[in-house]
Amino acid sequence: MAVKTVQYIIDGQTYNLTFDASTGEYKATVPAPSKSSYSQDGHKYGGSVIATDDAGNSTTINQSDATLGANLLLRVLEKVAPTLAFTYPTAGAYITNATPAIRFKVTDNDSGVNPDTIVIKVDGEKVTTSFTKTAVTGGYECSYTPGTALADGAHTISIEASDFDGNAATAKTVTFTIDTIPPTLTLTAPADGLITN
């Protein structure tokens, strides 16, 4: 009985293959799924092939097939890096607290943020102590409080992160100023103890 149709199914989409008489193969150009396969079992999309003859009998081969299954697995990588955003402090801010809580958010809408890649640097020095990473939809909200008071003056915080597909976000920075010293007031007139009429 002759083969009538051959179909390839992946990510819920079905594609019809065309017979190539010159090679004796069924072929099709199939677009990859639009989303990363990281969240799939084994981090790969599993496909299946269904061959149907003229009588309606069909044979299905999927990723669990011992011989051909590995050829039906597809790894799809996203190309968009995570998004980084500072919550506090804002750029150019003057802060009287020498140990401010640095807060920022890292999000990625596809393969997801790899929390092990989140890095904070204070004035170019990587923070090696632990900081808070709270899972939220699409990523993490993070907070870091310096263990040692920052000196008065300008400071720059930078943050970095990558997703599970290896896309690294461009480091984001914020510069602010610590100012813990109140202004000095000097009275120039009238002189102390002056009596006038």
Labelled PLM ranges:
Residues 32-45, 147-154:
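Surface-exposed, short loops/turns at beta-strand junctions within beta-sandwich domains
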Residues 1-10, 97, 108-122:
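Solvent-exposed loop/turn segments flanking beta-strands in beta-repeat/beta-sandwich domains
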Residues 52-62, 162-167:
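Short, solvent-exposed loop/turn segments at the edges of extracellular beta-sandwich modules
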Residues 65-85, 172-186:
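Flexible, low-complexity linkers/stalks enriched in Thr/Pro that connect modular domains
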Residues 21-34, 135-144:
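Aromatic sugar-binding surface patches on proteins
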Residues 1, 51-53, 78, 104-112, ...:
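Extracellular acidic, Ser/Thr/Pro-rich low-complexity tracts
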